[in-house]
Structures are given as C-alpha cells and as structure tokens.
C-alpha cells in the first residue's frame, strides 16, 4: 500500500479498513454480499485535533499505525489512487486494539 498524500482536517482521521477473511473456520467461504462491513481499521493519518471554546487545540488520542475499532456506519468512504479509505471523526473510533 502506497501512503496517500492526504492530511485530515480538525478532528478527522484517515483509516484503511482491514477486510475480514473470505474463509472462516471450517472452510466455509463467505460471499461478498453476505459479509458484514469491517469494523477494524489501521490509522493512516490524523488531523491536528479540534479547537475548544478558548481556541486551544485538543489533540487526537489515536496515532498513525494504531489498529482501531470503528463505528459500523460512521465516516465517509473515499478512493485515493484506486484504494479505498475512510475518513471519520475521532468520535467514530470506538477503541484502540492493543497487542
């Protein structure tokens, strides 16, 4: 994957979805139409954070390279150089996957 030349604004985060595997335990192949939307993603780029009421920048908690759980229907899907990414607000990130 070539890193896209894009910088999210404000409290937005650019992520690359981690597609679930096509074959599950037991060798069952899942057709594309039956797959659920992936909820795991890798953080590609982060914005500078949002401003509070005093104009002070609140930094984003995730960083580039973090593996995260995201809201199932949050964000906006974008294609950059033929690859699919998602831009979402920090609030659409549910958790950081550690380990």
Swiss-Prot record:
Q: Which cysteines are joined by disulfide bonds?
A: none
User: Which InterPro entries does the record associate with it?
Assistant: Chaperonin_GroES (IPR020818), Chaperonin_GroES_sf (IPR037124), Chaprnonin_Cpn10_CS (IPR018369), GroES-like_sf (IPR011032)
Q: Which GO terms describe its molecular function?
A: ATP binding; metal ion binding; protein folding chaperone; protein-folding chaperone binding; unfolded protein binding
Report the leader peptide range.
Answer: none
Q: What does this protein do?
A: Together with the chaperonin GroEL, plays an essential role in assisting protein folding. The GroEL-GroES system forms a nano-cage that allows encapsulation of the non-native substrate proteins and provides a physical environment optimized to promote and accelerate protein folding. GroES binds to the apical surface of the GroEL ring, thereby capping the opening of the GroEL channel.
Q: How does it assemble?
A: Heptamer of 7 subunits arranged in a ring. Interacts with the chaperonin GroEL.
Q: Which GO terms describe its biological process?
A: chaperone cofactor-dependent protein refolding
Please report the name of this protein according to its UniProt entry.
Answer: Co-chaperonin GroES
**What SUPFAM superfamilies does the record tag this protein with?**
GroES-like
Task: Report which superkingdom the organism of origin falls in.
Answer: Bacteria
State a GO cellular component annotated for this protein: cytoplasm
List where in the cell it is found: Cytoplasm
Q: Name the gene behind this protein.
A: groES
- Source species of the chain: Methylacidiphilum infernorum (isolate V4)
* Pfam family name, one: Cpn10
> Sorted alphabetically, which HAMAP family does this protein's record hold?
CH10 (MF_00580)
Instruction: Recite the UniProt keywords alphabetically.
Output: Chaperone, Cytoplasm
Per the record, the similarity remark reads: Belongs to the GroES chaperonin family.
